Swiss-Prot record:
Residues 20-48, 91-116 are annotated as: Disordered. Residues 36-48 have a biased composition (Basic residues). It is found in: Host nucleus, Host nucleolus; Host cytoplasm. HIV-1 lineages are divided in three main groups, M (for Major), O (for Outlier), and N (for New, or Non-M, Non-O). The vast majority of strains found worldwide belong to the group M. Group O seems to be endemic to and largely confined to Cameroon and neighboring countries in West Central Africa, where these viruses represent a small minority of HIV-1 strains. The group N is represented by a limited number of isolates from Cameroonian persons. The group M is further subdivided in 9 clades or subtypes (A to D, F to H, J and K). GO terms for cellular component: host cell cytoplasm; host cell nucleolus. Homomultimer; when bound to the RRE. Multimeric assembly is essential for activity and may involve XPO1. Binds to human KPNB1, XPO1, TNPO1, RANBP5 and IPO7. Interacts with the viral Integrase. Interacts with human KHDRBS1. Interacts with human NAP1; this interaction decreases Rev multimerization and stimulates its activity. Interacts with human DEAD-box helicases DDX3 and DDX24; these interactions may serve for viral RNA export to the cytoplasm and packaging, respectively. Residues 18-26 are annotated as: Homomultimerization. One of its GO terms (molecular function) is RNA binding. This is Protein Rev.
Length: 116
């Protein structure tokens, strides 16, 4: 893991294994029995899943000192984002990767469809 010490990696791996074990200890309910019995099993399973999720979040924040939720990425406004195909992008799916372009000006083609 880039930018972290080896001890932190070991703690992360240990914590992930614990969380994985928690989720594996709660398999989905069997689809048998009456409708009411299936509904009750699903309801109890969802409650256990919610508890496991909150325990996992607690483990990540307490043991590793980080949030369970990813840090939100600040993006520019959608009006400023456009696709620039003026360069030869290729069709293989691998060319042009790693050099995204953000243009400030929106092309007139896109603007004509947004006016009401």
């Amino acid at each position: 893991m880039a930018g972290r010490s080896g001890d932190s990696d070991e703690e992360l791996i240990k914590t992930v294994r614990i969380i994985k074990h928690l989720y594996q200890s709660n398999p989905p309910p069997k689809p048998e029995g009456t409708r009411q019995a299936r509904r009750n099993r699903r309801r109890r399973w969802r409650e256990r899943q919610r508890r496991i999720h909150s325990i996992s979040a607690w483990l990540l924040s307490t043991c590793l000192g980080r949030s369970a939720e990813p840090v939100p990425l600040q993006l520019p406004p959608l009006e400023r984002l456009t696709l620039d195909c003026s360069e030869d992008c290729g069709t293989s799916g691998t060319q042009g990767v790693g050099s995204p372009q953000i243009l400030v000006e929106s092309p007139a083609v896109l603007e004509s469809g947004t006016k009401e």
